[in-house]
Amino acid sequence: MAFNLLNKDIDTLTCPALVVFSKSSSQKDKLAKVTHSEIHKALLPSLEEKTISGKHQETVVFREFSFKGFRHVIVVGLGKENEITHESVRQSMASAYEAIKALNVTEAAVHFDGITAGKKDAADFAKATAEGLILTSYVFNELMSGKKETKEINVHVVSKMGNDKAVKAAFNEGAILGSVVNFSRRLGDLPGNLMTPTILADSAVEGAKGIANLKVTVWDKARIKKEKMGGLLGVSNGSDQEPRFIIMEYKGAAASKKPVCFVGKGLTFDCGGISIKPGAGMEEMKYDMCGGANVIGTLLAIAKLKLKVNAVGLVASTENLINGSATKPGDVHTARNGKTFEVNNTDAEGRLILADALSYATELQPQMIVDAATLTGAMVIALGNTHTGYFTRNSALKTKVEKAAAESGEWVWNMPLTDFHVKDMKGTYADLSNISSGKGAGSATAAAFLEQFVGEGIPWAHFDIAGTGWAVGNRLPYCPKKGASGAMIRTFVEIAKQYT
């Protein structure tokens, strides 16, 4: 799929399909309003019959409408004028793209000026438009042997403001974010035999090629052992695939400026180890590396956007499988920062590899650390797949997270983290246990475990994307109904912006 922003009068274009928009009726206007005045007049019968109501995401397709240079016309609802937001535009663009695809055309135009009429923040709507279209275009079918969806669709976003500097910059930002999210989605969707720790590391290296000021370093098993990462090594013992530790460094500010640090869990497949998972749904455990994939995407986006910030992305990657060398319940390992932990359940392994990554992040003395992980089933019970739960005790970072999430349109929910949760993670024979001695609160106690590997005074937030890392398309139309979502990449970029 190709997208571009054209500085043109929409009526001068020739194209198989045109997308215009409708807005719901109001006290002033008894009928819904189509945002293109001539098409509004031509569709008055449909408006009077309520075929077009302007309801958000309503899609009405007029085949063979033959308006000027357009063969088909698609009318997509924006909802009520005063309820149009950046997120609602993303979702309307998802409806627009699906309608374009259903028409089986190779080219379409979007009447962007119909969205921005009377709106001061045209640039923000341009960003949302690009994001919505590109995110919806994602399809993972490369492993199919039969007919694949390969038809190229060119979508022109047409506006008389197409040469406006702010509008162009925002559209390009949305296009970068959308493409990077799709890059990370693909990493998550690849099955475990085609997405090993080595392949994940190679993907980070490949994705960073040609991007200025972005460096990728990959530690192999020997280096990981030398660096005393006992958590990552311990989990990897049960697999023939060697672990990898991925370090992505972006230099966008003065060398004296401390970095912001993003940490991701990269479990490319997790059977649970000796504490083996039930068979039902185990195939979805290829998604246990989505936190890592999304941190890779975050660093790619920050670098492509040339943000004036120093940023580091760290991904600890391994498989959690079973062989004669696998970690056993009761085994004790030592993390990079010297703390010891009992592995009382080998299926609580993500926190063990994150322990080493967070310890390393602390050594960088960053301005803040944020981590992302498909960490606990308890988070799915608590919040389902609508919100990403996050934990932080730092009020300033909490404010930044909430602001960033509001800007990105991703839903987050602040979860409790207290000293009582820390107490529940104390070990009997080691400093810590990797599972709680208390009842319930599995997500909070997991966060409490991670907190023990973050340096005192460093602002830190933990995002548990177990419920939002994949299969969220029932709520978000620009996400696949099945498959990786790319959760939190856009929010993390917005967090990074606040440190520029």
UniProtKB/Swiss-Prot annotation:
- Cellular-component GO terms for this entry: cytoplasm
Q: Write down the EC number.
A: 3.4.11.1, 3.4.11.10
An annotated Gene Ontology molecular function: manganese ion binding
Q: Which UniProt keywords apply?
A: Aminopeptidase, Cytoplasm, Hydrolase, Manganese, Metal-binding, Protease
Which residues does UniProt mark as catalytic? 277, 351
Query: Which GO biological process categories is it annotated with?
Result: proteolysis
Q: Which CDD domains match?
A: Peptidase_M17
- What InterPro entries does its record include? Leucine_aapep/pepB, Macro_dom-like, Peptidase_M17_C, Peptidase_M17_leu_NH2_pept, Peptidase_M17_N
Q: What class of enzyme is it?
A: hydrolase
- Keyword field contains 4Fe-4S: no
**Subcellular location, record wording:** Cytoplasm
Q: How is the cofactor bound?
A: Binds 2 manganese ions per subunit.
Catalyzed chemical reaction(s): Release of an N-terminal amino acid, Xaa-|-Yaa-, in which Xaa is preferably Leu, but may be other amino acids including Pro although not Arg or Lys, and Yaa may be Pro. Amino acid amides and methyl esters are also readily hydrolyzed, but rates on arylamides are exceedingly low; Release of an N-terminal amino acid, preferentially leucine, but not glutamic or aspartic acids
Superkingdom to which the source organism belongs: Bacteria
Main localization (coarse): cytoplasm
Cofactor(s) for this UniProt protein: Mn(2+)
Q: Could you say which residues bind Mn(2+) 1 here? A: 270, 347, 349
Binding-site positions, Mn(2+) 2: 265, 270, 288, 349
Give the protein's function: Presumably involved in the processing and regular turnover of intracellular proteins. Catalyzes the removal of unsubstituted N-terminal amino acids from various peptides.
Q: Tell me which family the UniProt entry assigns to this protein.
A: Belongs to the peptidase M17 family.
- Annotated protein name in UniProt: Probable cytosol aminopeptidase
Natural source organism? Bdellovibrio bacteriovorus (strain ATCC 15356 / DSM 50701 / NCIMB 9529 / HD100)
The opening ranks of the lineage are: Bacteria, Pseudomonadati, Bdellovibrionota, Bdellovibrionia, Bdellovibrionales
- The gene designation is pepA
